[in-house]
From Swiss-Prot:
It comes from the Eukaryota. Substrate binds at residues 313-316, 461. Residues 247-383 form the DAGKc domain. Inhibited by N,N,-dimethylsphingosine. InterPro entries: ATP-NAD_kinase_N, Diacylglycerol_kinase_cat_dom, Lipid_Phosphate_FormReg, NAD/diacylglycerol_kinase_sf, YegS/DAGK_C. GO terms for biological process: dihydrosphingosine-1-P pathway; positive regulation of asexual reproduction; sphingosine biosynthetic process. Residues 40-106, 549-597 have a biased composition (Low complexity). The keyword ATP-binding applies. It catalyses: a sphingoid base + ATP = a sphingoid 1-phosphate + ADP + H(+). The gene is sgkB. ATP binds at residues 257-259, 288, 320, 345-347, 468, 474, 734-736. This is Sphingosine kinase B.
């Protein structure tokens, strides 16, 4: 990949490799002809003076220098093209007092709640006698409250600047003297202080599709004391009290994938860069040059120099990075560093899941610094997978597969002894062949932040790469093509149920938010069960009042909290369905007990699969998990509460987030940090038609596809996928293709620290 910025390689980097295309935006002007534009040579962080020939025009000073100069920030407002309706052309030289009062972190309420802010007590007020001007006109008062600033323009007209949008306040002039009432000049001059914000582009009743822009507000104060009071209150009330401190005292590492999506990453960076400069935050930029570049950075670089690592890309770059990060010896400390995503890809599943699909909104969240734990799934496959693909009519391998008489998947439990006879024989044969080899070196591992997919979804995701230039249309076209040429896959899916709820009950699980009770609890399963049961009780009472006897049986069952799960597959037998629904509390506790059973029966692969993800010299992830999951026999799994579904599938999706793309809400009730996996699959049934699949595709844009009888939905803690070798297909994690083989997936709760918005 060509380096479009033509930056030389970094010559010195603490505790890390020499990585190409690293640009420290604190180290911009080293050529002699550019030195005259530099604010201060002491602002250069890198003492080795690399010659970085970038075109960026703002110097970001050394974070160790307490007198942080910000004079280019205000002057830059003259060139603001991002709908900055309140531009001010004042080009003041400002110094930062570096006020660092660390108060309790600010917590946001709901974006743009005018009635709430008007009821709040006043923290500081400037009245009409102090002759403050806004837009060169005198205002009645300027009121600072906990949730924002109220500008009383007249008795009937006011403007509110919400604290959610405030990112910086310009520094006071160099000639500012707190001992006098005016500036230290012979003539009294108004003192201008500019407030930098990132506001909603238009009035929005909801924030599901929010879009933001830069905006500045400039106030003129007649006395030094008034300007000092305003400046100090802004710093202490809104900026110093942010979770990661004042943005002007922070430093972030930015990784850009120039090939993400429609290749707009550089343009998106230029857009958010101006907001970062407004805030005074210090940046180091790296443009990835090749596959696995981000993985190397995550594994080797000294990330402790930064308080946040930012990715301007799709989900793939973050996927690469965490697979390097969690392979470090010091991963326990490294994983605490907040990660942030500014969406620039095609699907942008994670960004959509946290409501930050707008790049400017994502940049604002980075500056505000609120974080939330993020689940990571450990995906494992046998390293040695040499069984070739065979055609549908001939099987020439030593492994055996079952051939159910029905095309619909069958559900197996510990009580289904007849269905396990073949599995027992297979396990015995493989136990002898494998000699009870439990060596973890034979296991390949990946870390997943989104999903494991097999069948329709992975086919569309991987095979639509040729339509990447079309952006969002890529997935729509790919899905239409694949449904018209539908593929059916045979295999098994083992899963460990976490919650004994049926599909309709799971739809009443509250959606995830920043202050989510489910994610914040120590026992997410119990909280979910309590919430659902309470909701069901209320619904049943209403139904009983309206329909006394029609739904009496259903109401009684729900009110008695008999939450034994029932099969969501309408085509399976009653006895089989009942046996699969006995996932009680012992099921939820059995994850850690899967340790010492014999190796399971089949290790499948394809010699036609594209090359596996190249891990090079980077070891597998170090995160503690059940490394023997693939070695469990079928009988052992079933005896511990696992369920097995075997048969023909259209597609399988196992996800830990709500969205896999902007128009694909895989599981609306998925939570970022509940320790659970949403397992969703479509069985191949007699009543299944291409029209019904197209309907499911359309409904997936809102999450209503889960209401279809054709879809099964389970909340699980872990799963094992065994695709049949009789037909080649695609298995993918986070949109990245992996070998077509037996695959396990296990959720590690709250493993990472993700930047999120703090309002809902």
């Amino acid at each position: 990949m060509e380096n479009n910025n033509n930056e030389p390689a970094e010559t010195v980097q603490e505790k890390g490799p020499k990585l190409k295309n690293d640009i420290d935006l604190n180290d911009q002007f080293k050529d002699e002809k550019e030195k005259k534009e530099e604010i201060s040579s002491s602002s250069i962080e890198n003492k080795n003076n690399n010659n970085n020939n970038t075109s960026t025009n703002n110097v970001i000073p050394n974070e160790s220098n307490n007198n942080i100069s910000n004079n280019n920030v205000i002057s830059n407002e003259n060139n603001n093209t991002n709908n900055n309706t309140d531009n001010n052309t004042d080009n003041n030289n400002n110094n930062n007092n570096n006020n660092n009062n660390n108060n309790e972190p600010v917590t946001s309420f709901t974006v743009n709640n005018k009635s709430l802010i008007e009821k709040e007590p006043t923290l500081f007020e400037f009245n009409q006698e102090q002759q403050i001007k806004y837009k060169n006109k005198s205002i009645n008062s300027l009121i600072i409250k906990r949730s924002g600033i109220v500008i009383k323009i007249s008795q009937k007209k006011s403007t509110i600047i919400y604290q959610d949008s405030i990112i910086a306040c310009s520094e006071l002039p160099d000639n500012f003297d707190t001992a006098t009432t005016t500036t230290t000049t012979t003539t009294t001059l108004p003192i201008k202080v500019t407030l930098f914000t990132c506001v909603l582009k238009k009035k929005q009743l909801t924030i599901d599709k929010e879009q933001r822009k830069r905006k500045s507000y400039t106030f003129q104060f007649k006395s030094n004391q008034d300007s000092l009071n305003f400046y100090s209150n802004i710093q202490s009330t809104f900026l110093n009290s942010l979770p990661r401190g004042n943005p002007k005292n922070r430093k972030i590492r930015i990784l850009i994938n120039p090939k993400s999506g429609k290749k707009e990453s550089h343009n998106i960076f230029k857009e958010v860069e101006q907001l970062f400069k407004d805030s005074g935050i210090k940046m180091k930029l790296t443009v990835t040059m090749e596959p696995e570049h981000a993985k190397k950075i995550g594994f080797k670089s000294n990330i402790y120099k930064y308080d946040t690592v930012v990715f301007i890309s799709g989900d793939g770059l973050l996927h690469e990075f965490i697979n390097g990060l969690l392979s470090r010896e010091d991963y326990e400390d490294a994983k605490k560093i907040p990660l942030a995503l500014i969406p620039a890809g095609t699907g942008n599943g994670l960004a959509n899941s946290i409501g930050l699909q707008d790049p400017m909104s994502a940049a604002l969240a980075i500056l505000r610094g609120f974080t939330k734990p993020l689940d990571v799934c450990i995906v494992q496959q046998p390293t040695v997978t040499t069984i070739p693909v065979v055609d549908n009519n001939t099987v020439t391998t030593t492994t055996t597969t079952t051939s159910p008489t029905s095309a619909s998947p069958t559900i197996t439990s510990a009580n289904n002894n007849n269905n396990n006879n073949n599995n027992n024989n297979n396990n015995n044969n493989n136990n002898n062949n494998n000699n009870n080899n439990n060596n973890n070196s034979n296991i390949t591992k990946w870390c997943s932040i989104l999903s494991l997919t097999w069948g329709l979804v992975s086919d569309v995701d991987i095979e639509s790469e040729k339509y990447r230039s079309l952006g969002d249309l890529r997935l729509i076209i790919g899905a239409a093509v694949r449904i018209l040429n539908l593929r059916i896959y045979r295999g098994k899916v083992y899963f460990l149920p976490a919650i004994p709820l049926d599909k309709s009950q799971m739809q009443s699980i509250p959606k995830c938010s920043f202050d989510c009770n489910i994610c914040d609890s120590s026992n997410s399963v119990k909280v979910i069960e309590d919430l659902v049961c309470n909701d069901n009780d209320n619904n049943n009472k209403n139904k009983n009042e309206e329909q006394n006897e029609i739904n009496s049986t259903t109401s009684n069952n729900n009110n008695n909290n008999n939450t034994t799960t029932t099969s969501t597959s309408s085509s399976t037998s009653t006895s089989t369905s009942t046996s699969s629904l006995t996932a009680t509390t012992t099921t939820a506790k059995s994850t850690n007990s899967l340790s010492s059973s014999p190796r399971s029966d089949i290790n499948m692969s394809s010699n036609s699969i594209s090359k596996s993800l190249d891990i090079g010299t980077i070891p597998s992830c170090k995160v503690t998990h059940n490394s023997n999951l693939l070695n469990e026999s079928s009988d052992s799994l079933l005896s511990k509460g696992w369920k097995c579904i075997e048969g023909e599938f259209i597609g399988v999706v196992a996800s830990t987030v709500s969205h896999l793309a902007s128009d694909f809400i895989s599981s609306p009730n998925a939570h970022l940090s509940d320790g659970l996996i949403d397992l969703i699959f479509i069985n191949n049934r007699s009543k299944l038609s291409k029209a019904s699949l197209l309907s499911i595709l359309t409904d997936s844009a809102t999450g209503d596809h889960l209401k279809s009888d054709l879809i099964e939905h389970h909340k699980v803690k872990a799963l094992i996928l065994e695709p049949s070798i009789q037909k080649h297909g695609i298995v993918a994690i986070d949109g990245e293709r992996i070998p077509y083989a037996k695959t396990s997936m296990e959720n590690i709760r709250g493993c990472l620290n993700l930047i999120c918005r703090s309002y809902h």
